[in-house]
């Protein structure tokens, strides 16, 4: 009998697999062409091999270890975008959820891709089966309201960080149920 309901892990890196979507090969994202022409050859390419995507065996070992826990929630940062994912091991066993915190002031997708940011976000969701949602347009933070039965995850943003005059934007909200993958 376990005395706890949630296992919450904090780390700076995203742990769920993130592959670059095929959209990066298109002319729509011409600002990235030179880098992407060198990197993409039609295969699934991890977004960042200097993070967990570069260490898939070690990620599986970590998943195996935490699979013995209840309701795993991985809190991550340092990607400068907001991410929300279900996590599954290589045998498609549900491991937990990942909450990737946004940047407060660092550059993100929105700073790189401008008007094409929503297209990039959607392409990431389509390319990555376990990725529920990504937002690279806004700066802010994430908060968790933890109860015995669920965790409410709220991504909170402001309209700009470049001025003292800003508007608080409507939060993006997810409810994580105990020991269940997120489903909308």
Regions found by a protein language model. Name each.
Residues 1-184:
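Long, structured stretches of catalytic cores involved in phosphate-ester chemistry, encompassing
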